[in-house]
A protein has these predicted regions:
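Conserved non-cysteine loop/helix-boundary elements of the Radical SAM core domain that shape
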Residues: 1-36, 44-65, 80-92
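Conserved hydrophobic beta-strand within the GNAT/NAT acetyltransferase core sheet
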Residues: 4, 41, 109-113
Length: 163
């Protein structure tokens, strides 16, 4: 499996990444697919992009036919270019996951970085909205929850689905 996030929409990409182009990322994903690799590609929401940017990212991921889609939620951190961004609301995060599920019907959608600090006790709602996977442990810039806590969340979600 090859992991290579688009990060955001083509329209917003240059505001986030300056070392390479959006088309470079597209070419890399296509090359990985041609090589027969499963591709995990998603992005970060809450960078300052619009809802339309998020929809455009999901549509691009659909067109690329990636296998799984991690949805990271920005946690503004001091000392980073995005430290002054307002944290994305829980409702915006859940709405985005629901839109991704509508667009990416059969794909694995994983809630990832930011889920603990942004969604807090409402992480189960992400699964009700359409997520069907999650990344656990630590992330690039923030610590995740303990595995035992995530296993409890999985059990809670199972109970919700059984009702």
């Amino acid at each position: 499996r090859y992991h290579h996030n688009l990060e955001t929409s083509e329209n917003y990409f240059a505001k986030v990444v300056t070392t390479h182009t959006y088309q470079d990322r597209i070419k890399t994903i296509k090359a990985a697919k041609r090589a027969g690799l499963e591709v995990c590609s998603g992005g970060i929401i809450g960078l300052g992009e619009t809802l339309d940017d998020r929809i455009q990212m999901a549509l691009a991921l659909k067109e690329l036919d990636v296998d799984s889609v991690p949805v990271n939620i920005l946690v503004p951190m001091e000392g980073t270019p995005f430290e002054d961004r307002a944290a994305l609301s829980q409702s915006e995060a859940i709405k985005t996951i629901a839109l991704f599920r509508i667009i990416l019907k059969s794909k694995t959608i994983k809630i990832a970085a930011g889920r603990e600090s942004i969604l807090k006790d409402f992480q189960a709602l992400a699964f009700m909205a359409g997520a069907n996977g999650m990344l656990i442990g630590g992330y690039l810039t923030i610590k995740g929850r303990e595995v035992d806590e995530d296993l409890k969340l999985v059990e809670e979600v199972k109970m919700l689905w059984q009702k």
